Amino acid sequence: MEIELNRFTPAEQATFRLRALYEQAGYRKYRASRFEEYALYQEYQRFLPDAQVITFTDLDGKLRAIKPDVTLSIAKTAQPAAGECKRFYYNEEVCRPSRESHTFQTIHQMGLESMGAVDADEQAAVVRLALQSLAALNVPTVLEISHMGYLTGLLDALHVPAEARAKLLDFLRAKNAHELRTAALAAGLDESAAAALTGLLDLHGPLGATLTAARAACRCETQRAALEELQALQNALGEAGRGIRLDLSMADEMEYYNGLVFTGYVAGIPCAVLKGGRYDYLMQRFTPGANAIGFAIYLDELERLAAPLPPVQQQSREKSWLNIALPKGRLGDKAYKLLAGAGYSATEDYNDTRKLVVENPDACVRYFLVKPSDVAIYVEHGAADIGIVGKDILTESGADVYELLDTGMGKCRMCVAGPAGFTDDESRALRVATKFVNIARDHYERRGRDIDIVKLNGSIELAPILGLSDVIVDIVETGTTLKENDLTVIEEFMPISARFIANKASYKFKYAQLTELLNKMKEALAK
């Protein structure tokens, strides 16, 4: 009896197709235990996506954990002999904390691992399977690759201090050129070295052309070796690898991956659905001399493909539109005027309508007018492709987006303020009133200061006046409100302005449209 796959959800269809694909390629199914001894995750914590796991004391008295990862379990038990390559695939659920809900959630993964004697041919075979896995989803996809050796080689060649690397890598991941350069100079690098780091952001595009550009930017043998490996991969894949894109600014999970890394995106899904790469360091902790490569597909994300298109998109399916989230208020007005001046005006003035969505069919742009604090959420979740948002809101939300431009609009600063003459009594916790809880906590953690946070949503200046707090953490533009209430700025610690942000998947699928708009916006700002 034939199974009609269209009766199943996208994730269920993918499971059938991928199982057949992996078994045909010689992979054996691995069945993981639901629980592992907590000691495993404690010892290899730096290889986990998050240090938080659910633990419990089992009936035998041992401390166990609900598994947050499958690869660790496979690596522990695989034990390939010298010269042997073991191949496994899995279809499992893992349990990890959610940044948004602040609760644990189950994540359905399907993936494969190749462990042991992993040579160039084996590596190419795994990447080919990643391409075939994406193709099995029957929707437009993109596979991006990179090599950790190119990035670490550059950091070493530039003598980047170890204590500065984490911050620089954060800016690289966000494609945040303006703050990457500033941080590089602050770390003691000269202009040439800072330019080399920001130049990584330009090394993305079709595999062949980007390899050529990357060779010209090489500074050490480690980088050249990484590019030779990527060239060998391109040669091995041949026609199958034509659609692969290279992005040498990828800096995800550098504690885990040590060589080739790759990420897969699906049209209509706002985040990566496939992640993988080489993780030799982890494998060698269990089996000395062994190497490993693998990837996982996040099946839960595929369920989005079954959802109907939003009403605003159902009438424009034949064209690719840019969906832009603008904040209501003065900043949104400034941003709209700038975009309108660059040729992206709407057919109707959004200030003269009660509509929340206005369009320009000729320019294929659509504006959403949203609460300022929600802009980053709309962009991160793919409801908008791009948006304009204040750095304060972007930092507080921790949204996983690309930060492509500092527009310079809406300049102000994040400050600690309090009554004139305030003296901090370090013998007790400092009471801090703010609506920027994460920013305040991070600021004082860096200083090693114990604080109690009072979260408020408005009229923050009232808190120290009424004795609710000792100080406040808030944005300050002119300082007039502070002065009128006998408060003064104690410390300025973060400059704020409006940032141009993009959804990561939209950046892959709408790159030409997005960069054209971005470049026109830069030209308008320069006038």
What label would you give each PLM region?
Residues 1-67, 124, 128:
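TRNA-binding/sensing appendages of the translation machinery
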Residues 7-25, 36-37, 71-82, 89-140, ...:
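Positively charged, Gly/Ser-enriched RNA/tRNA-binding surfaces
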Residues 52-101, 375, 380-389:
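Glycine-rich, N-terminal phosphate-binding loop and its surrounding beta-alpha-beta segment
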Residues 60-62, 114-120, 506:
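A generic structural motif
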Residues 317-527:
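Domain-level signature for soluble enzymes in the chorismate/prephenate branch of the shikimate pathway
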